A protein has these predicted regions:
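C-terminal structural segment of proteins
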Residues: 1-219
Length: 219
């Protein structure tokens, strides 16, 4: 696989990829959101007719680092921020990214502002590193004299697109690093989570990964 291929992956849902006529495929049903559905790997946030998740490990890291993605087509070149590259179902349920037919993702730019800054990435999966994530987290911070000056945190495996945790970031900036602050970040991360029938385990998993990211980056 390639970096571009990882970022531009389609939704991870066996009903959708198996050819079921779901909302994302142009139908009028979400087969993953019923009491009998197999949905342990599906979303906790921002479900809008579709509960499939973005399966990319790279995407949260690019969002945390405020990366830019360069896209080319016959008309020329355009640059899109990593956070704006991904499309939520409520905007357009038929696609996961802003890529149009004929578009090619040619490069990814990482801003110098985050060079040599504290960064953390972790994912939880059923098997080894090459498996799809159940939940992943990426965090980038600037810490001076024990106080968090800047923070960007993004997670994957919990929504249809990689999710930037702006409320968590706000709870960290200007605060002294420590266990209590990390605990607060974990609890803030899961506010508003809605578990499906078979994925309630993702809520404490998300809280713990965010908590660990804050402890590791600020430690």
């Amino acid at each position: 696989g390639t970096l571009g291929g990882n970022v531009a992956q389609d939704a991870r849902c066996w009903y959708y990829r198996g050819g079921m006529p779901c909302y994302r495929a142009g139908g009028n049903t979400c087969y993953a959101d019923t009491p009998t559905s197999i949905n342990r790997e599906h979303c906790l946030f921002d479900a809008d007719r579709c509960v499939a998740v973005s399966p990319s490990d790279t995407a949260p890291a690019l969002i945390a680092l405020d990366a830019e993605l360069v896209i080319r087509n016959k008309q020329g070149e355009r640059v899109v921020g990593a956070e704006d590259f991904f499309v939520a179902p409520k905007i357009d349920i038929t696609r996961m990214t802003v890529l149009e037919p004929g578009d090619l993702l040619t490069s990814i730019r990482l801003p110098r502002a985050w060079a040599n800054r504290a960064f953390y990435f972790e994912k939880a999966s059923d098997r080894q590193a090459w498996d799809f994530p159940l939940v992943n987290v990426a965090a980038a911070m600037v810490v001076q004299d024990g106080t968090i000056q800047q923070a960007r945190i993004a997670v994957g495996g919990v929504a249809a697109r990689p999710l930037r945790l702006k409320a968590v970031e706000s709870s960290l900036i200007g605060e002294k690093a420590g266990k209590d602050l990390a605990d607060l970040a974990g609890q803030t991360a899961i506010y508003g989570a809605r578990a499906l029938d078979h994925n309630p385990y993702k809520i404490p998993l998300l809280a713990n990964l965010v908590k660990r990211s804050v402890r590791s980056v600020t430690g």
